[in-house]
């Protein structure tokens, strides 16, 4: 159907295509549609199938041409992308440039459309790169194990009334509070009732948890708070507020004893407290190894990204911004709208001290590099590879192999699983080709927060 096509690559991994369709094809489709109308159209004064062609054209010509135009464009898209290697991104629909296109049955039809495609770039071979990554020497001591035990102790505690009736560190307190104006009148919009928090452990909006220590049930207190210029909540930063707080209830955690019985209550796979501690130590060691692997991969991707010029399409950046926005929302890291989030990205790029733009573009480049490595992997994923991966997931998740297999087949996700297997291959290859340099000694807690760029 396509008589000719002219393809031009534009900045931003955008493709511009000029398509020409023969007038013979246009006329054939128009005449076919005209005959179809003629065979079933009902017009007053004529029998069905007997309406003269000229009458139909006089009445419906523009509508017929519009129908043919839509069909020609859609069929041109199908034919073009059936042969073209540069396909559109799934979230970037091809756009026809011309407005108000019309058919002229006596001329070849030409139209232009643009679309964004996957960016083209070449990854340097491992022979061309020499990446050294400094990995800290991590030690896990008894205090790290004790911290995890204490967390389990808190998780398995019960909340009871505090018979002393006095607020102290770690008390679980229910309060009513409200802001007061300069005349000590309540500002109704700030009133909150039944607010529950743990003293010294929770981040309250007004940061008053220390101010209620020593208060008793039903006691009311007016306090004044001054907030520093870079206070965590911008609305309060650099201001002073007067608050009226009333204690409604005071509770505490009844913590179980840490002994063999405690370990057995956590899981029947532990017979003694030492069994539980050994499991925790093993889990922390796994966390350390996973973190080390992440640091190495981050170093690889950041180094390769610096060497590459990747012309990332706008729609791909937009999609990555939305992913970052949803992640931040899920982690309660921002209360902005998507539009505000995008505005910051395209302007300063900073939220607080974090460079949002660098983080999002860095993550996106890492994904592109990894996908390129997956696409270039010449080794096919075999059925045996798929079965082994399903068996591994079955063991880790504690569900049957048949359930895992049924899930992937029912959700039509086998191809995604194969890509995941290739990604793991790529990660393994990266890790094998990095040179690890022993770094400074760090305890477990510091290492968990360690960044490769520090």
UniProtKB/Swiss-Prot annotation:
Gene Ontology terms, MF aspect: peptidyl-prolyl cis-trans isomerase activity; protein folding chaperone; ribosome binding
Principal localisation: cytoplasm
Keywords, in A-Z order: Cell cycle, Cell division, Chaperone, Cytoplasm, Isomerase, Rotamase
Domain of life: Bacteria
Domain spans labelled PPIase FKBP-type: 170-256
Catalytic activities: [protein]-peptidylproline (omega=180) = [protein]-peptidylproline (omega=0)
GO terms under cellular component: cytoplasm
One GO BP annotation of this record: cell division
Enzymatic class: isomerase
EC number: 5.2.1.8
Protein family membership: Belongs to the FKBP-type PPIase family. Tig subfamily.
Protein name per UniProt: Trigger factor
Gene coding for it: tig
């Amino acid at each position: 159907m396509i008589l000719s096509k002219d393809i031009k690559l534009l900045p931003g991994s955008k493709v511009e295509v000029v398509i020409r369709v023969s007038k013979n094809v246009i006329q054939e489709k128009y005449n076919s549609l005209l005959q179809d109308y003629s065979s079933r159209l009902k017009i007053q004064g004529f029998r069905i199938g007997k309406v003269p062609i000229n009458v139909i054209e006089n009445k419906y010509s523009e509508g017929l041409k519009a129908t043919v135009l839509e069909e020609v464009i859609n069929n041109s898209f199908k034919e073009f992308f059936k042969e073209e290697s540069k396909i559109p991104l799934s979230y970037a629909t091809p756009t026809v440039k011309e407005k108000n296109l019309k058919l002229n049955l006596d001329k070849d039809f030409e139209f232009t459309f643009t679309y964004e495609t996957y960016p083209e770039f070449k990854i340097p071979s491992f022979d061309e790169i020499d990446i050294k990554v400094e990995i800290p020497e991590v030690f896990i001591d008894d205090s790290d194990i004790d911290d995890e035990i204490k967390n389990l102790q808190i998780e398995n505690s019960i909340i009871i009334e505090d018979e002393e009736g006095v607020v102290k560190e770690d008390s679980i307190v229910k309060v009513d509070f409200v802001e007061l104006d300069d005349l000590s009148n309540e500002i109704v919009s700030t009133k909150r009732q039944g607010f529950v928090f743990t003293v010294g452990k929770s981040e309250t909006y007004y940061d008053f948890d220390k101010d209620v220590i020593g208060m008793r049930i039903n006691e009311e207190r007016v306090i004044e708070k001054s907030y520093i210029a870079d206070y965590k909540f911008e609305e309060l930063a650099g201001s002073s507020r007067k608050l009226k707080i009333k204690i409604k209830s005071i509770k505490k955690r009844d913590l179980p004893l840490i002994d063999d019985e405690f370990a057995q209550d956590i899981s029947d796979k532990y017979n003694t407290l030492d069994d539980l501690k050994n499991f925790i130590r093993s889990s922390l060691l796994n966390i350390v190894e996973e973190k080390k692997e992440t640091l190495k991969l981050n170093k690889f991707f950041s180094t390769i990204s610096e060497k590459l010029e990747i012309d990332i399409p706008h729609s791909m950046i937009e999609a990555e911004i939305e992913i970052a926005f949803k992640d931040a929302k899920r982690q309660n890291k921002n209360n902005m709208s998507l539009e505000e989030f995008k505005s910051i990205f395209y302007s300063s790029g900073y939220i607080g001290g974090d460079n949002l733009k660098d983080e999002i573009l860095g993550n996106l480049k890492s994904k592109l590099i990894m996908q390129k490595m997956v696409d270039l992997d010449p080794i096919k994923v075999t059925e045996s590879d798929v079965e082994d991966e399903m068996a591994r997931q079955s063991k880790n998740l504690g569900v049957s192999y048949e359930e895992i297999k049924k899930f992937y087949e029912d959700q039509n996700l086998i191809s995604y699983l194969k890509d995941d297997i290739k990604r793991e291959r790529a990660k393994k290859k990266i890790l094998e080709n990095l040179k690890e340099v022993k770094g400074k000694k760090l305890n477990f807690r510091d290492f968990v927060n360690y960044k490769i760029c520090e």
